[in-house]
């Protein structure tokens, strides 16, 4: 069984760009507009003989009350539950936001290993 790594974070922090770079693909749509990734997207990271499944997710945003945003967030948390490790992506050009802190707290409560 291969290890599985979920890539999560708030909307538009570069999750899909990172996923495409690591999987050497263009399977994740990348744009300046948030909300394009709606479901989990699976890919394979290969380094030498080592292989790992990666899961690209939509942005987690608990401040949005619309059902589609709730579904996107739920899909991201399902990916976290499926994974053995989480890559928590933040925007390094900005201060840590309340939403970033909320996601971090939720990761800690789930007792998941994360980077």
Model region roles, listed by residue range:
Residues 1-69, 73-80:
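Conserved G1/Walker A P-loop phosphate-binding module
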Residues 47, 71-115:
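Conserved C-terminal guanine-recognition region of P-loop GTPase G domains, centered on the G4
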